[in-house]
């Protein structure tokens, strides 16, 4: 079922015209439904990779300015450092230690500004990240026309609540994909872990498939009709990853051309010789 639902902030004005959920916005753009951000002032709320995607996308849609608002420090953002640095190089401003308070709308119900509450970094929580708290300072008003909310994704597990156990809004399952106290039911992927990578979802699917096969009394061997060459068993020296170069950042704004320059033929040959395994061994039953 995937983690396709955007999380809400729960602040006043969140239903104003001009407030977008990041995942839905990015999906619409990918499917060809491109909004007109030309000349607009955009605020993006969040500090993860999705927020950076939304930020850099807004710049490519012609926004006059893009400000990313985050309640912790830049160093605490969960987005990849490369994404953060590239977004800043392309012209994004990151407003750190500011928590969304409310969204101001004009008389027509359109977004007029984002009000944020200054934060102070507090003690570290059980997740190893510092927990901010409200500073003794006045609210900050950031004029904007568009607000994009990118504070995470969630699944809608409510339809399954009557037939299987849930834990913190997700389907409860063990590492071998069995759902406890629910005979003949297996689960994996985002529905169990929450938002994660495609690789983890594929690995969970392989685990579930193998265990379902065994549960039904079979022991099928997966065969491929593609001829796989014999491996080279010699120990090759460690090989570093080819680092791609960016196009000049001023050329990236206003278009969706590739940011990374391609590899040479020699670099492609070297890169494709490196290990492509997911390193997921076993299915929990052997």
PLM features: residue spans?
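Mid-to-C-terminal Rossmann-like scaffold of FAD/NAD(P)H-dependent oxidoreductases
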Residues: 99-105, 110, 120, 207, ...
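FAD-site-proximal beta/loop scaffold in flavoenzymes
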Residues: 15-39, 107, 124-195, 235
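N-terminal glycine-rich dinucleotide-binding loop that anchors FAD/FMN and/or NAD(P) in oxidoreductases
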Residues: 14-22, 26-29, 78-106, 113-119, ...
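Glycine/serine-rich phosphate-binding loop and adjoining beta1-alpha1 elements at the start
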Residues: 1-28, 265, 269, 273-285
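Short hydrophobic core segments
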Residues: 1-2, 43-45, 144-152, 268
């Amino acid at each position: 079922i995937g983690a396709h639902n955007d999380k809400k902030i729960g602040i006043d004005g969140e239903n104003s015209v001009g407030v977008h959920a990041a995942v839905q916005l990015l999906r619409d753009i990918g499917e060809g439904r491109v909004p007109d951000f030309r000349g607009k002032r955009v605020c993006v709320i969040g500090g993860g990779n999705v927020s950076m995607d939304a930020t850099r996308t807004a710049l490519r849609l012609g926004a006059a300015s893009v400000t990313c608002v985050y309640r912790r420090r830049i160093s605490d953002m969960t987005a990849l450092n490369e994404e953060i640095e590239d977004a800043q190089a392309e012209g994004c401003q990151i407003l750190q230690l500011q928590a969304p308070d409310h969204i101001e709308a004009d008389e027509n119900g359109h977004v007029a500004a984002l009000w944020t509450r200054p934060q102070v970094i507090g003690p570290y929580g059980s997740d190893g990240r510092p927990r901010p708290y409200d500073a003794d300072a006045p609210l900050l008003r950031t004029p904007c026309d568009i607000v994009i909310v990118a504070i995470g994704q969630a699944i809608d597990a409510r339809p399954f609540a009557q037939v299987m156990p849930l834990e913190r809004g997700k389907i409860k399952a063990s590492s071998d994909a069995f759902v406890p106290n629910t005979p003949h039911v297996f689960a994996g992927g985002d529905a169990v872990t929450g938002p994660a990578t495609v690789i983890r979802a594929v690995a969970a699917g392989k685990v579930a498939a193998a265990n379902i096969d065994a549960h039904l009394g079979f022991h099928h061997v997966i065969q491929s009709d593609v001829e796989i060459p014999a491996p080279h068993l010699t120990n090759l020296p460690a090989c570093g990853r080819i680092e791609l170069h960016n196009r000049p950042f001023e050329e990236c704004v206003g278009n969706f051309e590739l940011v990374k320059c391609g590899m040479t033929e020699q670099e492609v040959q070297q890169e494709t010789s490196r290990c492509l395994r997911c390193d997921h061994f076993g299915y929990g039953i052997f």
